[in-house]
Amino acid sequence: MTPVKDQGHCGSCWTFASTGALEGAWFIKSGELLSFSEQELVDCVNLSFGCNGGNAAASFHYWKTHFPMSEASYPYTAKNGACVYNANDSYNNIQVTGPVGVTHNDKVALQNAVYQQPIAVAIEADTMYFQTYTSGVLTDAVACGTNLDHAVLAVGFGQENGNDYFLIKNSWSADWGDQGYVKLGADNNNGVCGVQMDPNYPGL
C-alpha cells in the first residue's frame, strides 16, 4: 500500500478510494507499487463532480479509455481544475476494464474480495462517532448510520475482542484515526457505517 494520503478541503474522497484500489490491484498483479494521480480524476472524470463529490465506479469507467497518470506527473491541488491529461505521460501499460461490483450487504462476499485486493467502499462519515475514532473496532451501526457520504478503501479483514471488522484506509491524513486507518464492524446486514453497502474495484 502507498502511505495514507490527505484529501484536504476538497470532497475528492472518491478519487483516493479509486487510486488506492488500483494501486493495490496493480501491485498484486505486477509487484510494482505506484502512486496514481487523484487530481487527474478530480479534473477529468466527467461522470463525477471533482471536489463536489463522486464515486469510485466513475473513475473505473474513466480508466477504461484513459491510462492512469502518476501523482508526480499530475500532483494534487485539493481544488477543481482544467483537465490536463497527457497520454504520453501516463502508465499506458495499465488497462482497466471497468468497475467490478461485489455483492452488496454481504459480509462474506466483501471479506473474500478484500482477501484478493483492496476494495473501494462507501460509508457514512459525518457522525462524531466516526470522526472522533482513535482505536479499536467501531461496532455501533446505529450511531454511525448508513447515509453514504464518503468513499474509503477496505484493505483487510480481521477480528478483535470477538468483533469481526474491515480495516479501512481513509484519506484524512495519517494524523486521523489510528494512523489514518479505522476498523469498521462487519455484520450480516449493511456493516457499520454502511461499509458493506456499495463495494467495487477496478478490473485489470
What are these regions (language model features)?
Residues M1-L204:
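Catalytic-core signature of thiol
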